UniProtKB/Swiss-Prot annotation:
Protein name: Large-conductance mechanosensitive channel
Compartments, as annotated in UniProt: Cell membrane
Membrane topology: Multi-pass membrane protein
NCBIfam families to which the protein is assigned, alphabetical: mscL, PRK00567.1-4, PRK13953.1
Family from the record: Belongs to the MscL family.
Function text: Channel that opens in response to stretch forces in the membrane lipid bilayer. May participate in the regulation of osmotic pressure changes within the cell.
GO molecular function, one term: mechanosensitive monoatomic ion channel activity
Annotated GO CC locations: plasma membrane
Organism: Listeria welshimeri serovar 6b (strain ATCC 35897 / DSM 20650 / CCUG 15529 / CIP 8149 / NCTC 11857 / SLCC 5334 / V8)
Record InterPro entries: Mechanosensitive_channel_CS, MS_channel, MSC/AndL, MscL_channel
Amino acid sequence: MKKMLVEFRDFALKGNVLDLAVAVVIGAAFGKIVSSLVDNIIMPVVGVLLGGLDFTKLSVTVGKSVIQYGAFIQSIVDFIIIAFAIFIFVKILTSFMKKKEQPVEETPVPPTEEYLKEIRDLLKEQQKEI
């Protein structure tokens, strides 16, 4: 049992697990921001463009049940905006990583310099022979 607790502690304290936990917390906070953006800015504008339609109040009553499809539409818009924001973030991040990984190319040596180096080396060899 003690070995299992030690293994769990080692697993939980690994950098990847902690990074994932931080990402989940930040993602949840980001989701709240996007939901607020959709609920308070985007959907009211869409509602005005559609003739004063308030999506939060769209519903259908079936028997004693109320189906709030307006809230569902808002959830879809939330998802699309969050997915697009994550896509843009990942795209920017990968472009930075690609720039960082690209090796610096050496400038090619002009042929005249190569010839001069060969002549120098030949002259050194001739002087050694003398």
